[in-house]
Amino acid sequence: MANIKSAKKRIKVIETKTLRNKMIKSALKTKIKNFEVAVANNDLNEAKSAYTIVVKALDMAAAKGILHKNKAARKKSRLATKLSGLNA
């Protein structure tokens, strides 16, 4: 346990940020799952709208530093491949 006042504050700040990051990651996983369900059901319109939502969420997570920008780009690429497979 920290004894210094600033260290105690940093612990509180880290806990707050960790909670926020977990919430954002959880919401992101839910959005990705919704997209994959739409793709599995061969619902093109639903998949397109879900894809735009997922891409926006991935970009925001990358901008906030929750995900690395390359990981976000990789996920977007793989989801786009699934979407294009649905178009064909």
UniProtKB/Swiss-Prot annotation:
Belongs to the bacterial ribosomal protein bS20 family. Disulfide bonds: none annotated. One of its GO terms (cellular component) is cytosol. It comes from the Bacteria. GO terms for molecular function: small ribosomal subunit rRNA binding; structural constituent of ribosome. One of its GO terms (biological process) is translation. The keyword Ribosomal protein applies. Binds directly to 16S ribosomal RNA. This is Small ribosomal subunit protein bS20. Keywords: Ribonucleoprotein, Ribosomal protein, RNA-binding, rRNA-binding. Transmembrane segments: none annotated. PANTHER family: 30S RIBOSOMAL PROTEIN S20 (PTHR33398), SMALL RIBOSOMAL SUBUNIT PROTEIN BS20C (PTHR33398:SF1).
